[in-house]
Regions:
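Short beta-strand scaffold segments in enzyme catalytic cores
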Residues: 4-9
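Low-complexity intrinsically disordered segments
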Residues: 46-140
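Short, flexible N-terminal segments of the mature chain
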Residues: 15-63
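Short acidic-glycine loop/turn motifs at beta-strand connectors
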Residues: 10-15, 107-111
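Residues that flank catalytic or metal-binding motifs in active/ligand-binding sites
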Residues: 3, 27, 100
Length: 140
């Protein structure tokens, strides 16, 4: 059975809480169909976002799509994953609750110098913090 999630990309704004859902703040959105648990997807996001620099939020979202689409490397050749990862128009969100088990919010300022991640299981906030902390919290 698939463990699905949405990955939302949002601007950090003063006074906006990281431990609440903020679908009205979403700039970009990815639908991830499989392996969305924090110990899989969360660790992947934490490791990737900790070590890469981005120009702006569009660059950040594109980088995450690229990372999630590349599944296996053999002899230097990476094989892109077909399916499973989809870009979704965030303006089409009506009620996203009900079919995804996890929601990831990636928060950043316009210069992408500081990134924070929030992880939810339904309406329960499981994690709020920087990428490295997410990675170390859920690594086996």
């Amino acid at each position: 059975m698939a463990t699905r999630s949405h990955i939302y990309f949002c601007d950090r704004e003063p006074g906006v809480s990281f431990n609440e859902h903020h679908q009205d703040k979403v700039e970009f959105m990815i639908y991830n169909h499989y392996d969305s648990h924090p110990h899989t997807l969360g660790v992947t996001l934490g490791a990737y976002l900790e070590d890469v620099k981005f120009h702006d939020m569009g660059c950040l979202a594109a980088g995450v799509v690229g990372k999630l689409k590349m599944t296996a490397c053999h002899d230097g050749d990476c094989i892109p994953k077909v399916g499973d990862i989809y870009l979704v128009n965030p303006n089409c969100l009506i009620d996203s609750h009900g079919y995804e088990e996890y929601t990831y919010y990636i928060w950043t300022k316009p210069d992408c110098k500081e990134i924070w991640i929030s992880v939810f299981n339904d309406d329960i906030c499981l994690f709020v913090g920087p990428p490295r902390t997410l990675q170390t919290k859920y690594e086996d």
